[in-house]
């Protein structure tokens, strides 16, 4: 009887430790507020980071943020400063308009599309060339 109680208690402890958001994440992934994160200290272009994240998990993409608390959580597990965010082509041509309100239909950009990188130490976001290489955090 005592052994049954001990085993039952052990199973209860295991169940309670797995219940919650952590149980939904694959091993090697961290959980926060119902999302799963995996930090990769591996520099790559933004396009490669997007592809890499979807290879790690079908629903995964470079990280995006919903709150400053989410950023604080990620900073606590990071070992590097700069990483790609899941934001690309911030000067989205479909939304551009001239100051008089007319649509931009002629373009002569001198650079390629821009992507966004985050500096973890102070949560500052910067636009940069998508062809540069930075680390990536995948999220789903």
From Swiss-Prot:
- InterPro entries linked: C-type_lectin-like, C-type_lectin-like/link_sf, C-type_lectin/snaclec_domain, C-type_lectin_CS, CTDL_fold
Which tissues does it occur in?
Expressed by the venom gland.
Q: Which SMART domains match?
A: CLECT (SM00034)
What cystine pairs are annotated? 25-36, 53-138, 115-130
Q: Which UniProt keywords apply?
A: Disulfide bond, Hemostasis impairing toxin, Secreted, Signal, Toxin
Give the multimer and partner information: Heteromultimer; disulfide-linked.
State the name under which the record lists this protein.
C-type lectin 6
């Amino acid at each position: 009887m005592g052994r049954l109680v001990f085993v039952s208690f052990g199973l209860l402890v295991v169940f309670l430790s797995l219940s919650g958001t952590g149980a939904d994440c694959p091993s090697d992934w961290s959980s926060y507020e119902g999302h799963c994160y995996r930090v990769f200290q591996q520099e790559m272009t933004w396009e490669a980071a997007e592809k890499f994240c979807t290879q790690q998990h079908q629903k995964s993409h470079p990280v995006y943020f919903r709150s400053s608390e989410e950023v604080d959580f990620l900073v606590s597990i990071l070992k590097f400063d700069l990483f790609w965010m899941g934001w690309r082509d911030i000067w989205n041509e479909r939304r551009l308009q001239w100051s008089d309100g007319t649509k931009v239909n002629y373009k002569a950009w001198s650079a390629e599309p821009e992507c966004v990188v985050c500096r973890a130490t102070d949560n500052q976001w910067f636009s940069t060339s998508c062809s540069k290489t930075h680390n990536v955090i995948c999220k789903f």
